[in-house]
Amino acid sequence: MINLKNKKIGVLCGGTSSEREISLMSGKAVYNAIKKLGFKTVLIDVNKNVAQKLVKEKIDVAYITLHGTPGEDGTIQGMLEVMGIPYTGCGVFSSSASIDKIISKKIFESAKIPTAKWTIIEKLKPFEEIEYPVVVKPASQGSAIGISIVKNKKEFEKAVKLAFSYEDRILVEKYIKGIEITAGVLNGKPLPVIEIVPKGKFYDFKSKYTVGQSTHIIPARLPEKVLKKIQNIALKVYDEFRCNGTCRVDMIVDQNNDIYVLELNTLPGMTQTSLFPDAAKSMGLSFEDLVLEILKSAK
């Protein structure tokens, strides 16, 4: 566990991804919490000059609140390791593997972690006939950006066009009807399971970041045995991806209480509508307490 006494903490946020605004919101919330905790801190908007900023500010520990690239793909983690600056959250491997939904699927399958059937579609390449309904996702976007649920060929063509506007590889997976849930892990220990009830069709960008657009039920309305199984799956994902500090595993539970892992989030949001702080709060951890626990895991 890192000694934080007299350390200056740089909160890294912003970046250049499609999730920039969410990252700035997370960063500001964490920055304010660190100030309340009594530590020296500075908010750093990440750009190509971030290394110079870290040196200029004499940062001892980096608290990463970047969503998307370069914070969730291992880029910033690799740079910080080269610079010898301890940082919060997952390392290079878990970050780079989890941001790519296709690589994640392959790891899930090799580790026998339950996940929905899937296929890859690449731009300008032929693909197999699709059985509807399916979920279409860009391979490495977060915050539900570019995701569509489709029931027929016409909707599929529109969804593929949208997903390809973000990148050249997309993931198409079987749509599983059920309860949307998420399970967080904090420093190797499971948090209470959250049931997500969005106002819209599914937990999209608007539902995630607009107050009142989704309800978080803690714990999820599932049998205790199922909740325990969900937590164990989350811990297995945490271990298989060699996570550190925090992660959040999104899943679907169908009508038979079968569980399917959707994806791993190595940098859970820290905004007022975010799931991870809600789960921590339900077990008695204030936002400041949560930030301190995450800081202690920096390495």
Residue ranges and their predicted role:
Residues V11, K151-N232, V253-Y260:
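Phosphate-binding site of ATP-dependent enzymes
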Residues K174, A183, Y238-M270, A280:
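Conserved metal-phosphate-binding beta-hairpin within the catalytic cores
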Residues T41, P86-Y87, T115, V134, ...:
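Hydrophobic beta-strand scaffold residues
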Residues A144, K199, N265-A279:
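Glycine-rich phosphate/pyrophosphate-binding beta-alpha loops
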Residues M1-F93, A97-I99, I103, S110, ...:
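ATP-binding N-terminal substructure of ATP-dependent carboxylate-amine bond-forming enzymes
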